[in-house]
């Protein structure tokens, strides 16, 4: 099934896989999903990710992380903020702090996809894609 909003599709697949305690999940590979996966990996929310397939059928295989004996998912909350029907833009002064700095907001800026902390440090704003903690 083709998804019009690849970011929401990616976040939903990760959220569902975490709740089912799967070790991996597959998401369609686009520049945007690769960038978001890189930010999640750099922030320690997911393990590795690798690209699989050729041509149109490219997928990212994302390795999920858990903690403790009960395998609690590292990602406890994953929410899409800016949607195709209602885009949410914030300037550098309005960038949100998620849970007082414990979580992250993933921002799409003119300099690429980054966390809210990095965007604040560079002094740039952009589209708030999602919140993660």
From Swiss-Prot:
<keyword id="KW-0687">Ribonucleoprotein</keyword>
<keyword id="KW-0694">RNA-binding</keyword>
<dbReference type="InterPro" id="IPR047863">
    <property type="entry name" value="Ribosomal_uS8_CS"/>
</dbReference>
<dbReference type="GO" id="GO:1990904">
    <property type="term" value="C:ribonucleoprotein complex"/>
</dbReference>
<dbReference type="InterPro" id="IPR000630">
    <property type="entry name" value="Ribosomal_uS8"/>
</dbReference>
<dbReference type="Pfam" id="PF00410">
    <property type="entry name" value="Ribosomal_S8"/>
</dbReference>
<dbReference type="GO" id="GO:0006412">
    <property type="term" value="P:translation"/>
</dbReference>
<dbReference type="GO" id="GO:0019843">
    <property type="term" value="F:rRNA binding"/>
</dbReference>
<comment type="similarity">
    <text>Belongs to the universal ribosomal protein uS8 family.</text>
</comment>
<comment type="subunit">
    <text>Part of the 30S ribosomal subunit. Contacts proteins S5 and S12.</text>
</comment>
<dbReference type="InterPro" id="IPR035987">
    <property type="entry name" value="Ribosomal_uS8_sf"/>
</dbReference>
<comment type="function">
    <text>One of the primary rRNA binding proteins, it binds directly to 16S rRNA central domain where it helps coordinate assembly of the platform of the 30S subunit.</text>
</comment>
<keyword id="KW-0699">rRNA-binding</keyword>
<dbReference type="GO" id="GO:0005840">
    <property type="term" value="C:ribosome"/>
</dbReference>
<keyword id="KW-0689">Ribosomal protein</keyword>
<dbReference type="GO" id="GO:0003735">
    <property type="term" value="F:structural constituent of ribosome"/>
</dbReference>
<protein>
    <recommendedName>
        <fullName>Small ribosomal subunit protein uS8</fullName>
    </recommendedName>
</protein>
